[in-house]
Amino acid sequence: MLSPTESAAPATDGTPAPVGGGRGTPAPVGNEPAASDSTGSDPAGAPPAGISPAGISPPGTSPTGTSPPGTSPTGRAARRRVACRVLAGAAVVWAAAMALHASIPNAGVNAGSLFQTLLPWTGLGVPSLLVLAAVLRSRLAAVAVLAPAVVWVTLFGGALTDKRAGGGDLTVVSHNVDEGNADPAGTARVLAAAGADVLALEELSDASAAVYSRELAAAYPHHAVIGGVGIWSRHPLADVKAVPIMPWTRAMRATVRAPEGPPVAVYAVHLASVRVSTAGFTTGRRNDAARELAAALRSETAPRVVVLGDFNGAYRDRALAPVTSRLRSAQAEAGAGLGFTWPAAFPAVRIDDVLVRGMTPRAAWTLPATGSDHLPVAARLSR
């Protein structure tokens, strides 16, 4: 054992082992902290650079000091580019669907007919796409959104102008009066106030037909009712007959003989209703009725024809093409606006119309609401 004053034996490598008050770094005395063994380093216990004292990386960085995946400026730019391309692609597809609406398949749920019925409303997508393009600050998306806008204006821009003009020598009105109408007398007064030469009424019951006959007798001394449809006229009627378009009578024809002009063949029609259900847009009976009506029109020899009624479909619906391809819409040629007629509380589609052949529409419009769920439609024509 060494005494306190003796030196330690040399180490095997020749380096003396410091002890007590020997040479070299002195041993800590009492509570004095040991000195760092590297000159200029951080104080003892300081965390490495990039690590917080608690051992957690600062917000927004990884332990290595970089941004988390997907939050870097490069990642955000990449996602924005993808969003812009998706938006531009959606706009182009939307424009193509609008432009090629007649080519959308009608198999299964009759998607094509439903799309064509609601076609005017497709323009509502354009402002939404423009807002998204502005949020993304994308010139590509903004330019792409112009495509559906141009297509919609091409299809319906003319309807936004007032094409009504003066002239005309025959005014006609058509109205689905609604079998459940609680005020047929009030409805008759609204119709009489329009001052038309000819009225065509659809969805008549035996009881309501009697009310209309009574209320309209003073202004319209000539009338005929067959099944659920009827024609009231200021001028004599001739050649009155039913038109068989369905198993039950929902169409008729009469010749209106006005003294100041040539006779006109007038049809009052009510095609079968359509249904939107889990089975899709069911239109079979209506389509059959349209084909039967088209056959009757093919055999019609009168040079001047007016078809008034509830077609339960829009003029552009391909299923009505057998009829509409032979006639012209007074609303499309001489109306103001889109002329929606149903439902009366918030008209969203035009399923009631005035179609003509051999006559010139001068003006077309809708009348004020009655007790029916349809709005009446009117047109002034030149023979």
What do the PLM-derived regions correspond to, one by one?
Residues 2-32, 39, 58, 63, ...:
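N-terminal, active-site-proximal structural segment of metallo-dependent hydrolase catalytic domains
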Residues 42:
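Short Gly/Ser/Thr- and charged-rich N-terminal loops/segments
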Residues 172, 178-192, 203-383:
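Soluble catalytic domains of enzymes that build or remodel membrane lipids, polysaccharides, and related
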